From Swiss-Prot:
Region (Disordered): 219-277
Organism: Streptococcus sanguinis (strain SK36)
Protein name as it appears in the record: Large ribosomal subunit protein uL2
Keyword Ribonucleoprotein attached: yes
Lineage: superkingdom: Bacteria
The entry's keywords: Ribonucleoprotein, Ribosomal protein, RNA-binding, rRNA-binding
Gene Ontology MF terms: rRNA binding; structural constituent of ribosome; transferase activity
Functional note: One of the primary rRNA binding proteins. Required for association of the 30S and 50S subunits to form the 70S ribosome, for tRNA binding and peptide bond formation. It has been suggested to have peptidyltransferase activity; this is somewhat controversial. Makes several contacts with the 16S rRNA in the 70S ribosome.
Record's keyword annotation contains Ribonucleoprotein: yes
Amino acid sequence: MGIRVYKPTTNGRRNMTSLDFAEFTTSTPEKSLLVSLKSKAGRNNNGRITVRHQGGGHKRHYRLIDFKRNKDAVEAVVKTIEYDPNRSANIALVHYTDGVKAYIIAPKGLEVGQRIVSGPEADIKVGNALPLANIPVGTLVHNIELKPGRGGELVRAAGASAQVLGQEGKYTLVRLQSGEVRMILGTCRATVGVVGNEQHGLVNLGKAGRSRWKGIRPTVRGSVMNPNDHPHGGGEGKAPVGRKAPSTPWGKPALGLKTRNKKAKSDKLIVRRRNEK
């Protein structure tokens, strides 16, 4: 999709851009694949804020996405390419030959009328899903499983892709978008291709209101709060932090502290960390 640039007719329109939606073939989603979605506004079951800066925004329906792609050897035809308000990637409605309808993440280059299939014997074509052990070295993939049968969990955002680097016993070496090289079981499935809508990250919202439409609330700096609200708060005028290092609102170290569990069992599956040269 292309980027639409607006003329600076108002302050809010100045520098504003959006996607032109030329790729979409319908604006009406498949009703049988919609479920209602209650707004949580960042609260948990106790009503306490667990995720800040969430709330408001346009009401949405959730689209049921098939991340498992486990209907083996059953062909599906791509019927539509659609917008999904719940994710950055676009989605595609596919009709299987046995009558089942499903939504999948739309990879770059997927077109209406194209036929896709899942299974170990599937061809290496955009949109086909097969075990990592059956995918040639160098192939770009997305929607990667971490456990066989659990459904794709990695590489699902707009424009994202991972590359198959090789096979090592029962594991497949995969380079993720971050640069991390990881071993994943060869029986885990992945979909061939790069996730579409790769220009999503180039959009300039232009005004605060567009963030509010998305359900994103303002992010207030700690230094402009009161001392009872944040460790950085208080003082006269533009006061410095007043501590050895910046802190979170709850007094824990911020900016640079490693938060990964040092005893994570998956450490043995990481061949190269994302921050290593």
